[in-house]
């Protein structure tokens, strides 16, 4: 991490900026293959929380969750949300959201927030971390792979309606 980039915990004063970043992420993901279902099923609770008044407060109050912000030259340009999930006898870290504004990609902010989230998962005793990339989203897939992640599952989906992507 260079002096230009930093990672910090979100606070309730960041609610408006978190809402903006969440909305940007939703718009970007929503047009990708599998995006609409992903938004409804996998990220629905986090997105709804960040988009509603008081929602960030609820996420911040949950000790099994972490909301991080990445800054570049003092401006908030990234959001990462993770949670610890009990799986059998151990905990699994789950990255619910990791979004960096397009103008701030490739400068290290995404890696910085990811490293901070993985560091938190390690400290609280998680044995592994899961993150999601949509089919065809090579940028996200490459980002996670370059940071030590490996695919462990592919989810297949068959729409029963012609209108669903």
Predicted regions and their residues:
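Extreme N-terminal starter segment of soluble prokaryotic enzymes
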Residues: 4-7
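Acetyl-CoA-dependent GNAT
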Residues: 9-13, 20-90, 96, 101, ...
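Residues that form or flank phosphate/diphosphate-binding pockets in enzymes
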Residues: 90, 108, 139
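Conserved acetyl-CoA-binding loop-helix of GNAT-fold acetyltransferases
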Residues: 97-100, 106-119, 142, 146
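Conserved beta-strand-loop-alpha-helix junction that forms the acyl-donor binding cleft
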Residues: 105, 131-140, 157-159
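Conserved active-site alpha-helix within GNAT-family acetyltransferase domains
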Residues: 111, 123, 135-153
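Conserved GNAT acetyl-CoA-binding A-motif
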Residues: 121-133
